UniProtKB/Swiss-Prot annotation:
Catalytic activity: 6 reduced [adrenodoxin] + cholesterol + 3 O2 + 6 H(+) = 4-methylpentanal + pregnenolone + 6 oxidized [adrenodoxin] + 4 H2O; 2 reduced [adrenodoxin] + cholesterol + O2 + 2 H(+) = (22R)-hydroxycholesterol + 2 oxidized [adrenodoxin] + H2O; (22R)-hydroxycholesterol + 2 reduced [adrenodoxin] + O2 + 2 H(+) = (20R,22R)-20,22-dihydroxycholesterol + 2 oxidized [adrenodoxin] + H2O; (20R,22R)-20,22-dihydroxycholesterol + 2 reduced [adrenodoxin] + O2 + 2 H(+) = 4-methylpentanal + pregnenolone + 2 oxidized [adrenodoxin] + 2 H2O
Biological processes annotated in GO: C21-steroid hormone biosynthetic process; cellular response to peptide hormone stimulus; cholesterol metabolic process; cortisol metabolic process; glucocorticoid biosynthetic process
Associated pathway: Lipid metabolism; C21-steroid hormone metabolism; Steroid metabolism; cholesterol metabolism
UniProt subcellular location: Mitochondrion inner membrane
GO CC term, one of those recorded: mitochondrial inner membrane
Protein name per Swiss-Prot or TrEMBL: Cholesterol side-chain cleavage enzyme, mitochondrial
Keywords, alphabetical: Cholesterol metabolism, Heme, Iron, Lipid metabolism, Membrane, Metal-binding, Mitochondrion, Mitochondrion inner membrane, Monooxygenase, Oxidoreductase, Steroid metabolism, Steroidogenesis, Sterol metabolism, Transit peptide
Similarity-based family: Belongs to the cytochrome P450 family.
Organism ancestry: Eukaryota, Metazoa, Chordata, Craniata, Vertebrata
Oligomeric form and interacting partners: Interacts with FDX1/adrenodoxin.
Entry-linked InterPro entries: CYP11_CYP27_families, Cyt_P450, Cyt_P450_mitochondrial, Cyt_P450_sf
Transit peptide: 1-36
Chief place of localization: mitochondrion
Alphabetized SUPFAM superfamilies for the sequence: Cytochrome P450
Organism from which the protein derives: Oryctolagus cuniculus
């Protein structure tokens, strides 16, 4: 996470450490190794630059500019206007926005073992009103930690990920065959956005349940396609309720709220069907030949989570994997299509790794650094989440401002990725930048 925690030096009116780069014109006394000790106390919270404290007026201007779906551009404009930190009220949500990697390191180093995250209001409202079970996405404190530890071992650990490789390879091969078939038939249009959604869902269900749903066949299960459409609708209808209380949308039974509820209902209904169906299939199968049986089977075997908690987490992972995976792939293909020289380099690397690995996909994945760098570069230019959010556990000084505990701080991913002081030629798709061994670039490893 970059720099070690320095927040212990930044409490109250104590002296603070900063880099040799002077910030906001505050004087400093030089010490050894380029570090300075600030000679002033941190400035108060209300002095953080802001476009205005009237959250509803700010929200009105945002809507007037049709900026709800372009809020990442607003972040960039505000950073250009106010500097590397600013605060803003939008509706009933007040946040401090940061983009400096050193500030981000301080933020995450101060969060403790149970981070307090910003929970998406419409998602919380739906789950609470309809009493739906929640998983790691919406849990807090000890409940979040218990689920996260269990999922780390079965979903995030390197040994667990190795089990996914043959399952993902099978889906990938089927996806390529499907596209080749269309090319040979002369019906390939070039628009594969819907196919990428199907590929993402087929991949996730295969590693979740150890079986395919047939999303890449000519005839697709209507319920499975309905699930994908519901995920899109759930995300789309969330945006208007991020700054206005979802209870207002529910009170007036707006179409936004009704569509949001309908989307979540489909997600829960179908995810529950899949989980129950594969659960009983697994119980009836006595011998699977020692092959990996999927995340669901592994979670059931650990006894660390109740069946209800498992179902809630399976639902969230299925819903969260479709849009995020497919959009990243779509942007990655777009960037490679616009940089044909880089595309040829990536193809050459993959072919060489394939020959060297002699069919061992796990070994092959260890020999494609440029491919991995290209995915990092795609996420720099097109991050899945516009911001990452944390509520401060304790007071914290950022950019020489004292920010009180419980304040919502948002890391502007898009703004940081496009900032020329952090990335040379930030608009350029340049994967080799991630292969640089520059020791000063520790924040982005």
């Amino acid at each position: 996470r970059g720099l070690p925690s320095r927040s212990v030096f930044l409490r109250g009116c104590q002296a603070s450490l900063s880099t040799a780069q002077e910030r906001l014109g505050h004087p400093g006394v030089p010490t050894r190794e380029g570090v300075r000790v600030a000679t002033r106390s941190p400035r108060p919270y209300h002095e953080i630059p802001s476009p205005g404290d009237n959250g509803w007026l700010n929200l009105y201007h945002l809507a007037e500019e049709k900026g709800t779906h372009r809020v990442h551009y607003r972040h960039v404009q505000n950073f250009q206007k106010y500097g590397p930190i600013y605060r803003e009220n939008l509706g009933n949500v007040e946040s401090v926005y940061i983009m400096d990697p050193e500030d981000v390191a301080l933020l995450f180093n101060s969060e403790g073992p149970q981070p307090e995250r910003f929970l998406i209001p419409p998602w919380v409202a739906y789950h609470e009103y309809y009493r739906r079970p929640v998983g790691v996405l919406l849990k807090k404190a000890q409940g979040w930690k218990r689920d996260r530890v269990a999922l780390n071992q079965e979903v995030m650990a390197p040994d667990a990920i190795k089990n996914f490789v043959p399952l993902l390879e099978a889906v990938s091969q089927a996806f390529v065959r499907m596209l080749h078939g269309r090319v040979q038939q002369g019906v390939f249009s070039g628009d594969i956005s819907d196919d990428l959604f199907r590929f993402a869902f087929e991949s996730m269900t295969n590693i979740m349940f150890g079986e395919r749903l047939g999303m890449l066949e000519e005839t697709v299960d209507p319920e499975a396609h309905e699930f994908i459409d519901a995920v899109y609708q759930m995300f789309h209808t969330s945006v208007p309720m991020l700054s206005l209380p979802p209870s207002l949308f529910r009170l007036f039974r707006t179409r936004t709220w009704r569509d949001h509820v309908a989307a979540w209902d489909v997600i829960f209904t179908n995810a529950d069907k899949y989980t129950q169906s594969f659960y009983w299939d697994l119980r009836q199968k006595q011998d699977l030949g020692g092959s990996y049986r999927g995340i669901l089977y592994s979670l059931l075997g650990t006894s660390k989570l109740s069946f209800e908690d498992i179902k809630a987490n399976v639902t969230e992972m299925l819903a969260g994997s479709v849009d995020t995976t497919s959009m990243t792939l779509q942007w990655h293909l777009y960037e490679m299509g616009a940089a044909l020289g880089m595309q040829e380099m990536l193809r050459a690397e993959v072919l060489a790794a394939r020959r060297q690995a002699q069919g061992d996909m796990t070994a092959m994945l260890q020999s494609v650094p440029l491919l991995k760098a290209s995915i990092k570069e795609t996420l720099r230019l097109h991050p899945i989440s516009v911001t990452l959010q944390r509520y401060l556990v304790n007071d914290l000084v950022l950019q020489d401002y004292m920010i009180p505990a419980k304040t919502l701080v948002q890391v502007a991913n898009y703004g940081m990725g496009r900032e020329p002081s952090f990335f040379a030629n930030p608009e350029k798709f340049d994967p080799p930048r991630w292969l640089d061994k520059d020791k000063n670039a520790t924040h982005f490893r």
